[in-house]
Amino acid sequence: STEVSQFLEKVAITPVQQDAEPEGRLLFAMDATASRETTWDRACHLQGQMFQATEGIGSLAVQLCYYRGFSEFHSSAWCSSAKILLREMSGVKCLGGHTQINRILDHAMKEHKTKRLKAIVFVGDALEETADHLCHQAGQLGVLNVPLFMFQEGSNPKVKSAYQQMAQLSGGAYSPFNLQSAGELKDLLTAVAVFAAGGKSALKKLTTISPPAALLTQQLKG
């Protein structure tokens, strides 16, 4: 689709600060409210495949964050093992509640102050907060060179508009999170993981074997 193509194109032109850090830190945040229950397990499986994509490129450390229920917010320890992270994710039970995307963005900024984040992935299907405030937070992340990769499950137009604006303001990218096209979705997540672990040069190499990754070069800020 055009949206997927634009997402893939933007990732490849997102600036990554190069340094001597041994690993890329990727914050993986998910909405774990009741509406996501039916797709949670499949989404977890796809997320775990992100680690495999970075083998031989550079190490990737991932922290899982999610919100659910009545003001519940959780963040895991940083993890470089797909098995450990998948075990943690599979133990999460979705509970009804309002979105708390602002808490995820606040947490991300605090983590970045401790040690730099390379990227943030967010998967959700709703927005019950003030979009203007979230866009302001996204803009702050953009100043810090921490791009947001916003994945939307479902097709709510208001949610889509807000997610797109947040991605743009942070210097990141937006894409539908379509579990009916698991292969395509895997390629999208893989491209973000490779970007976080090895930067643009690693992503460029991936484009030679992954058509979706090849398209991930135009949506992000240059």
Place the predicted regions along the sequence by residue:
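VWA/integrin I-like adhesion module and closely mimicked acidic/polar interface patches used
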Residues: 126-169
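Active-site-proximal beta-strand/loop segments in catalytic clefts of secreted hydrolases
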Residues: 65-68, 123-125, 151-154, 177-179
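Loop/turn elements at helix/coil->beta-strand transitions in domains of secreted/extracellular proteins
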Residues: 58-60, 115-118, 144-148
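Surface-exposed acidic, glycine-flexible loop patches that form ligand/cofactor-binding
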Residues: 17-19, 53-56, 109-116, 140
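Von Willebrand factor
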Residues: 1-77, 81-123, 127-129, 154-164
